[in-house]
């Protein structure tokens, strides 16, 4: 299908878990993810994890996994989001500059976000995102709608609403 843009993770995903209380002998569940090529489909992945005794590497491994969760602050010095019909504009500054920026947007009902166009000028990142309705036609009105986004630069990410 033409004009479909997908975003997300590639090659590796980490899901840190905290089990409170006495852990079961085996933790089982089903993880449902959308997998995409030309079309996105929901796929169920049954899993089974046998809890192990914490070894010397546990604290390091746990801290590493938790470090991959987007922060609430700390990546950007300032963040501004604006909207004009058909276009979302995200502007962020970062004193350390931008080396490998990325922008990921949560979905909003009946709104499609196209692939962001990123432009870096020194410590300033500007992302322009074309916006259409679910049919790829008219631009919806995003005023007064809540939007959650993740800005990333390399291994550091920040989630903002």
What are these regions (language model features)?
Residues 1-161:
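Extracellular/lumen-exposed scaffold segments
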């Amino acid at each position: 299908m033409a004009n479909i843009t997908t975003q997300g993770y590639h090659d590796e995903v980490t899901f840190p878990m905290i089990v409170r209380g006495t852990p079961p002998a085996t933790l089982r569940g089903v993880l449902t993810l959308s997998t995409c090529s030309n079309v996105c489909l929901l796929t169920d992945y049954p899993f089974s994890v046998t809890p192990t005794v914490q070894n010397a590497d546990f604290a390091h491994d746990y801290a590493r996994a938790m470090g991959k969760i987007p922060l609430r602050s700390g990546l950007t010095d300032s963040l501004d989001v604006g909207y004009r019909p058909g276009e979302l504009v995200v502007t962020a500054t970062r004193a350390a500059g931008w080396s490998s920026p990325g922008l990921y947007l949560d979905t909003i009902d009946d709104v499609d976000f196209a692939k962001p166009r990123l432009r870096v000028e020194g410590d300033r990142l500007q992302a322009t995102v074309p916006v259409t309705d679910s049919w790829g036609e008219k631009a919806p009105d995003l005023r007064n709608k809540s939007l959650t986004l993740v800005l990333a630069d390399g291994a550091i990410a920040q989630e903002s609403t």
